[in-house]
Design a protein with these regions (language model features):
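Alpha-helical transmembrane bundle of multi-pass membrane proteins
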Residues: 1-172
């Protein structure tokens, strides 16, 4: 009933808050890249498990735990840490332009996700072949792409000066 929906919403908010604080307190000790990698793996697992529970129509506590895993993983990685890393990786001469492009790209892709989800969710393919799980599998796939991208392409910025970052980019 409504009480269960309220409890679930409280769990979502609590996990989001707790794991945001995990990011705040570990970003300097663990580094940015390890948080990205761990968070992206958690996001992939959360979306994959959720997609599987929807596909098999076995929704219940496992679905809720998968959602909480995704929320917690995002809150400790791609949510807050990306902004720390972006502010550290660009030299002063281009930082404002680079941050503007990053923010614009984020909002563009947020709009794409928000507008594509209902289209994919309501599609005949999704409803007839995937029992409503296709969007979660698609987003899980994008988490894998993000994982490989971070692993191969994103440098660790922890403890690096702006000069070191500038030298890193000029050698690539």
């Amino acid at each position: 009933g409504p009480e269960d929906a309220l409890k679930q919403q409280l769990w979502l908010g609590a996990v989001n808050l707790i794991f945001t604080f995990v990011a705040i307190y570990t970003v300097d000790s663990l580094g940015r890249k390890p948080l990205f990698l761990a968070g992206t793996v958690g996001m992939f697992l959360g979306l994959s498990i959720l997609g599987t529970t929807i596909y098999t129509q076995q929704m219940g506590i496992v679905s809720l735990l998968a959602i909480l895993l995704f929320i917690g993983s995002f809150a400790m990685s791609m949510g807050p840490v990306v902004w720390v890393m972006l502010s550290e990786m660009f030299p002063n001469s281009v930082r404002s332009v680079a941050m503007s492009i990053a923010v614009a790209a984020q909002w563009l892709f947020n709009a794409i996700v928000a507008n594509s989800f209902p289209l994919v969710n309501e599609s005949n393919l999704n409803q007839n072949s995937f029992n409503g799980a296709l969007p979660y599998f698609i987003f899980a796939f994008f988490c894998l792409i993000a994982l490989v991208f971070v692993w191969k392409m994103v440098p660790e910025t922890k403890g690096k000066s702006l000069e070191e970052m500038e030298n890193l980019w000029s050698t690539k």
